[in-house]
């Protein structure tokens, strides 16, 4: 019995570490995909989301926070810094208005950003630490869970009100309209769990199972989004990387919630 308990705990710790790796490395992929995206835009004489002088500071801050989080040095503080950096850069891009996206794409982009910020707040609370020396901050974790709940509300909303998102699910998942409605209900129920703070671990476990097929079949079909929906290639790659980061946050809450 003791050996079974020990092996189960070891497996949970291993999965939790995997979630931490995926989430803490997310800013690296975000910076790389942004650089590639803005390089493509420069060839077409189009501006980046953030003016160039500030863009370098923004990416430098993101890489700095991600590096310290990855090495586990003051992870809580730098996770909080990463959340703040992402919030400021997203606000600057939104206010700047250099690039105009469709409403449905804005929801996809900003909802994922909100979820990643929530994941960093969960990490800043002390969740996902293998050897926790300080008590966990329940207020930070609750705030992060609310951000993840807001993301799920946006996804559920898009399934009902965005033609592009509905068609993506209809074209890539079996079951047709019934499957779309099933995902809508699942996203709604999971959102309620995260927003209310009840059954968070169970909700995170369900979300961790739900996200991989969605990432592989829908977000992972880059050619579909680029050719059919005119989403820039590296923008879709950035969204895919953020989905992986959200999966990492769900894994952390599922194993250490």
UniProtKB/Swiss-Prot annotation:
It is found in: Membrane. It comes from Bos taurus (Bovine). It comes from the Eukaryota. PANTHER family: TRANSMEMBRANE PROTEIN 101. The chain crosses the membrane at residues 21-40, 52-72, 77-97, 110-130, 139-159, 182-202, 206-226, 233-253. May activate NF-kappa-B signaling pathways. GO terms for cellular component: membrane. The lineage of its organism: Eukaryota, Metazoa, Chordata, Craniata, Vertebrata. This is Transmembrane protein 101. InterPro entries: TMEM101. Keywords: Membrane, Transmembrane, Transmembrane helix. It is a multi-pass membrane protein.
């Amino acid at each position: 019995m003791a050996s079974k308990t020990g092996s189960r705990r070891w497996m949970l710790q291993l999965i939790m570490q995997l979630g931490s790796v995926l989430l803490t490395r997310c800013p690296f992929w975000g910076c790389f995909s942004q650089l590639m995206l803005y390089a493509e835009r420069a060839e077409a004489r189009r501006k980046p989301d953030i003016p160039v002088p500030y863009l370098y500071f923004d990416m430098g801050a993101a890489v700095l926070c991600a590096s310290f989080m990855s090495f586990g040095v003051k992870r809580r503080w730098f996770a909080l810094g990463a959340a703040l950096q992402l919030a400021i850069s997203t606000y600057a891009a939104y206010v700047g208005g250099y690039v105009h996206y469709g409403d449905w794409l804005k929801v996809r982009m900003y909802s994922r950003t909100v979820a990643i910020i929530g994941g960093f707040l969960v990490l800043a609370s002390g969740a996902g630490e293998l050897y926790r020396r300080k008590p966990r901050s329940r207020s930070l974790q609750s705030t992060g869970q609310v951000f993840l709940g807001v993301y799920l509300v946006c996804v559920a909303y898009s399934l009902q009100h965005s033609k592009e998102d509905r068609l993506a699910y209809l074209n890539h998942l079996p079951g047709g309209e019934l499957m779309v409605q099933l995902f809508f209900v699942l996203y709604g129920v999971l959102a309620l769990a995260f927003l209310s703070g009840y059954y968070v671990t169970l909700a995170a476990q369900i979300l961790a199972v739900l996200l991989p097929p969605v990432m592989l079949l829908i977000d992972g079909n880059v050619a579909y989004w680029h050719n059919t929906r005119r989403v820039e290639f590296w923008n879709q790659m950035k969204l895919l990387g953020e989905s992986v980061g959200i999966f990492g946050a769900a894994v952390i809450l599922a194993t250490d919630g």
